Every structure is written in C-alpha cells, then in structure tokens.
Amino acid sequence: MIINIHINFFMTTISSVFKKLDKQCALIPFITAGDPDLVSTSKALKILDQHGADIIELGLPYSDPLADGPIIQAASSRALKQSINLNNILDMVNITSSNIVAPIVLFTYYNPVLNLGINNFISAISRAGIKGLLIPDLPIEESDYIISVCKLFNIELIFLLSPTSSIERINKIVEQAPGCIYLVSTTGVTGQKPELTGKLKRLTETIKKMTQKPIILGFGISTAEQIKEIKGWNINGIVIGSAFVKRLSSDFPEEGLRKIKDFCTTAKSIIIS
C-alpha cells in the first residue's frame, strides 16, 4: 500500500474535541465509505465538518457486518460492488483530511485488521490521517496488543459497551479503555429505533460515576426528539448513523449531500440550544 502523505495541521484529536466542548455534547455523524462513491464520501466529510460535526465516524465496507442494521448493510453492499477497499478509502481520506478539522474515526470489523496485520493496519490508517479506531467485534481479552500499537501511532481506540453488560464487565471495559467509551443504546444491530429507555439513562449515570473518560452513545439514534432527550443525559457525544447513511443514499449524489448538510445543521442546532 502506497500513500502520498498530506500532513494535516488542522485536524484535531478526539480527546481534544471533548476537552474543548467541556460539558457540551459532541455531534458524531457516521457514513459508509464509498457509498454512493468515494468522490461523494470526500464531499460528505467536508460538508459534515463545515456544518456541525465535531467528530466523524467513517465505516469501512465489510461483507459480513454483524453489528449493522439493514440501511448500513445495504450501503456496505453498494460500496463493495464498486470495488471499494481499504487502499482507495485511505487514499481518499489522506487527501480529504487535510481540508477538515473534525477528527475521523474508522469503524471496521476485526477481520480486515487481522488480514493486513495489526501493525500494518494501524500504521496505514495513521498515515492517512485517521485519528480514531472502533472495532465492534474486538474482544477486550485480546485488546492489549492493539491498544499498545494504537498508542504508538497516536490512534485513539474506542471500546464498545453493551447495555446488557454485567457490572463486572462494565468495570473491566471502563478500566481498560484507553479513551472514550461507546455505549450502545440498544441490544442488536444499528438502525433507527423509535424510543430510548429509562434503564439506558440510568446506565449512563452509573458509568459516569465510575470514570472521567468521555461517554458517547450510539446505535438507533435518528430523530430530533431522541437528540433532545439524550443531550440532557450528561454524556459527551451522540453518534448518528443510519439517518445520515439513508439520506446520503439518495438517487442523486448531490441531493444526498444536500440532505446530510441540512440534517447535520439541524442536529447541531438541537444540541447547542
């Protein structure tokens, strides 16, 4: 893999975003790389950065996305049919990241990391300008080495925490997580869910008492009502995925870009209001 390096003096780190926002909630949109095409993905990253995104999550298309709902699965399938892969995604990110401030988190399953080799994978995404990494199927019991490699390359590894986790499991993840913790809002896959629960709110309160590490919430958040509710939970970030992916997958790329711009602007205005 050969990447021409474009040094980015503007993109911030994930931890610095949370420090800057202090108690304000970060807006974290998710989009799938290569859907509808890589040119549109590059434009989408810039649009999201310019219209309220504090951090941007970029999904690496994968053939067996167990944690993804139907909207994101379909987006991955469309991207893979165009021969979108890690190499051309990182080439695009390398060029685009020099024009944006919001740090990019790469969402990928563990298998692509293992196929390339942990050191090679982390080195490659770091050179391209990626600032964070989220691996939903990474077993915490196998995470020590990848944590050390991420630290070496200044990549912030984000751990997932399920709402069904035992207290013992929560303690282990909270203690081992090198940075922010991604709390899954519902059991099952990603997607647009109608409501959130009081149990989830109580869980966020419990975790906040256990750690000073930033807590972000995602999976199933898609409406203005949900954003309004969650921003009052004293969490550090809201991840919105399927709602952005669905809008971006419009019949015409420019229409999709307009839709995500409008939705990003709306979501940010709700958070800061």
UniProtKB/Swiss-Prot annotation:
Disulfide bonds: none annotated. GO terms for cellular component: chloroplast; cytosol. InterPro entries: Aldolase_TIM (IPR013785), RibuloseP-bd_barrel (IPR011060), Trp_synthase_alpha_AS (IPR018204), Trp_synthase_suA (IPR002028). Pathway: Amino-acid biosynthesis; L-tryptophan biosynthesis; L-tryptophan from chorismate: step 5/5. It catalyses: (1S,2R)-1-C-(indol-3-yl)glycerol 3-phosphate + L-serine = D-glyceraldehyde 3-phosphate + L-tryptophan + H2O. Keywords: Amino-acid biosynthesis, Aromatic amino acid biosynthesis, Chloroplast, Lyase, Plastid, Tryptophan biosynthesis. The keyword Secreted does not apply. GO terms for molecular function: tryptophan synthase activity. Signal peptide: none annotated. The active site is at residues 57, 68. It is found in: Plastid, Chloroplast. It is an enzyme of class 4 (lyase). It comes from the Eukaryota. Its EC number is 4.2.1.20. Gene3D superfamilies: Aldolase class I. The keyword Plastid applies. Belongs to the TrpA family. The alpha subunit is responsible for the aldol cleavage of indoleglycerol phosphate to indole and glyceraldehyde 3-phosphate. Tetramer of two alpha and two beta chains. This is Tryptophan synthase alpha chain. It comes from Porphyra purpurea (Red seaweed).
